[in-house]
Amino acid sequence: METVTSLVFIVNLLIIFTSVVNQARGDTCIDGLGYCNNCDERCKAKHGPSSESSCDRSVGVPLCKCYYECESPPSPPAPPKKCDGGAGICSQRCQGQCCDMNCAQKYIGGHGFCNTLGTFSFCQCEYPC
C-alpha cells in the first residue's frame, strides 16, 4: 500500500510539473497533458493540427506529451533614429544650456550642444525622427 501511495504521489507531482512547465528544445516545445486518454485529440485542440502527441510510459503510468512548434519571441523594437539639425550660433550670450533649450523648442525631443568648427561655434541639435 505504501508503494502505491508513493507511486501515486510521484505521478501527481510529475503531472503537475509537466503541465505547468514547457520545455523548449530548439524550435519544438513539449507540453505535458496528463493521462493518455484522447491524447492526440487534446494535443491538436490545444496546440493546432501540426502538433504531434505520444504516450510516455517510462514512469509506469502512461502520460500524454504534446510536441508543437514554439512561437518565436517578438523581436525588440528598433531604436529610434536620430536626426541632426541646427539652432544658430553659440556665443557668450547663448552657450551650452541656451543651445539645448533652443533645440528643445525647435525640435520635439531635441537636445543641443555647442560644436566648434575652426573659429565658429554652432548650436548643433539631435532629435528623434
Curated annotation (Swiss-Prot):
Presence of the UniProt keyword Aminoacyl-tRNA synthetase in the record: no
Disulphide connectivity of cysteines: 29-70, 36-55, 39-64, 43-66, 83-129, 94-114, 99-123, 103-125
Localization (cell): Secreted
InterPro entries: LCR (IPR039641)
Leader peptide range in chain numbering: 1-26
GO biological process entries: defense response; defense response to fungus; killing of cells of another organism
Keyword set, alphabetical order: Antimicrobial, Disulfide bond, Fungicide, Plant defense, Secreted, Signal
Annotated GO CC locations: extracellular region
Family: Belongs to the DEFL family.
Free-text function comment from the UniProt entry: Confers broad-spectrum resistance to pathogens.
Protein name: Defensin-like protein 182
